Each structure stands twice: as C-alpha cells, then as structure tokens.
C-alpha cells in the first residue's frame, strides 16, 4: 500500500469510526430510553442521559420553519458544505488541521444521517447542568456528532489563531 493510499485508508477508518460510534449511541438511546425520559443521572443531576429530538439546528433554532425549507437549509446546504470540508481535509498537509476538518465532517454526516432517516428529528441525549451560566440552568442537550463538530472547530481555531501564527511569526 502506497503512502497516499495508506493516508486515505486512515482517513476512511477515522471518519467511519466516529460516525459509527455516533450512530450506535443514538441507536441505543432510541432503543432503550423512552422519548422525553431521563435514563440516568450522575453527580447530583450534573450529567444526565435523556432522550430528546431536535428538529432544528444548533440549540433547536429553526425548528418552527416549514418542512420544505428545512430540507434546503438543514440537509441540502449542509451536504454541500460537508463535501467542501471533506475536500479541504483530503488536501490538507497539516495533521491538526486535517483532524479538525475530519471531526467537523464526521459530526455533520452523523447528524445528516439522522435528518434523512429519523423524521422525528436528530437524536440528542447528553445533558449537563449549567448552573445559571448565560442564564441557562442546563446546557442544550446534544449528541456525539455535535461534540465532534465543536471539538473540530475549537481545534481548528486554536491551531490557526495561536499555534500556526506563532510558527509563522518566528
């Protein structure tokens, strides 16, 4: 196997593993946790597994818009954006940037799978107490795909704003 083939294989395994873990976790929540109920909580209700559905996007924004507009804004546009992100990841030479882009891609694909095959919405289940920060008693419930996107974005921004600029300035 050539170096380029091995690189593509590693990318494939990384992405498929993340998407599989996201979809498996959602499958288990759907199978074992009744919609709207709390499966269990830890540390005096700090962390809970709860089964909710999100028909909107980030923090349920847009859940009220018409179904045909949702198809455009929540499925079609993200698919084009994800294709672009994936193509950037394949071309990227820097490992940190590539991983951050692949995390964003994998999370986006995980949630698009839900939008395509779960008409009642994206499965969210990770729920944390937020102690009134930003006026929130609890952080909006999310899933692993959401985490991949957020971690990928943070990694990308930290690298781009702090590490890469520091290297370029020396």
From Swiss-Prot:
Class in the EC hierarchy, top level: hydrolase
Catalytic activity line of the entry: Release of signal peptides from bacterial membrane prolipoproteins. Hydrolyzes -Xaa-Yaa-Zaa-|-(S,diacylglyceryl)Cys-, in which Xaa is hydrophobic (preferably Leu), and Yaa (Ala or Ser) and Zaa (Gly or Ala) have small, neutral side chains
BP-aspect Gene Ontology terms: proteolysis
Keyword Protease among record annotations: yes
A Gene Ontology cellular-component term: plasma membrane
PANTHER family: LIPOPROTEIN SIGNAL PEPTIDASE
Family indicated by similarity: Belongs to the peptidase A8 family.
Known role: This protein specifically catalyzes the removal of signal peptides from prolipoproteins.
Protein name: Lipoprotein signal peptidase
Organism (species): Borrelia garinii subsp. bavariensis (strain ATCC BAA-2496 / DSM 23469 / PBi) (Borreliella bavariensis)
